[in-house]
């Protein structure tokens, strides 16, 4: 049925002179789906980075944990956890009709979590020499996520891939900043793991010739 539907749409588009647009749209959908698992895994790793900042609070009783989560480290941990979940959700939405627009919303949401309203603002409140650098790095992650969301809105694999590459680079810079702050160091490794997966997804979308193609099982 799906093949028949594409044939009918192709014939209609050829009649109206829009066959190029149709081919581009179909190709974009397939390309985005190829990067789906990298986004889901990368988002999951970033979510674990947030969990690393919340690990101490999770071992406390309810009242003590509630107070710890309200501290700058806890607020940043919750924000990073929510941002990672939103990035993973963006990858999952590629499966559905209209999924690229929904994925763009999710990526924009992740940018809000990293930006000045939550993560960056909380990091700036930490009383540590490297806290200001970490806050600036979080803002850079938010900016890169915004560019990625724009690429998704435009259904542009190249722009989305470039955006994800920028997100990966800024996540690594954030991890470097976290290494300099003892309170944040526990989250650095997971941020780097997430950056690696997002970079792989960006390479798929950007059409990096060095990116190995995965063989799909043959259907009979």
Q: What is the predicted role of each segment?
A:
Residues 2-20:
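N-terminal chloroplast transit peptides
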Residues 24-220:
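N-terminal plastid-targeting presequences
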């Amino acid at each position: 049925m799906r093949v028949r539907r594409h044939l009918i749409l192709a014939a209609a588009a050829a009649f109206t002179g829009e066959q190029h647009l149709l081919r581009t749209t179909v190709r974009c959908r397939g390309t985005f789906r190829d990067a789906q698992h990298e986004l889901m895994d990368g988002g999951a790793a970033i979510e674990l980075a947030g969990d690393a900042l919340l690990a101490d609070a999770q071992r406390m009783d309810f009242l003590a944990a509630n107070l710890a989560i309200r501290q700058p480290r806890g607020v940043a941990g919750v924000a990073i956890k929510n941002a990672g979940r939103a990035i993973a959700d963006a990858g999952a939405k590629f499966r559905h009709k209209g999924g690229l627009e929904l994925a763009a919303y999710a990526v924009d949401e992740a940018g809000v979590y990293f930006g000045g309203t939550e993560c960056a603002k909380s990091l700036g409140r930490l009383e540590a020499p490297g806290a200001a650098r970490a806050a600036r790095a979080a803002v850079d992650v938010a900016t890169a996520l915004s560019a990625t969301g724009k690429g998704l809105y435009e259904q542009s694999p190249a722009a989305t891939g470039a955006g994800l590459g920028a997100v990966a680079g800024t996540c690594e810079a954030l991890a470097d900043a976290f290494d300099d702050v003892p309170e944040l160091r526990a989250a650095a490794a997971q941020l780097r793991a997430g950056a690696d997966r997002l970079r792989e997804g960006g390479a798929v979308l950007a059409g990096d010739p060095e990116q190995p193609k995965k063989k799909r099982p043959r259907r009979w």
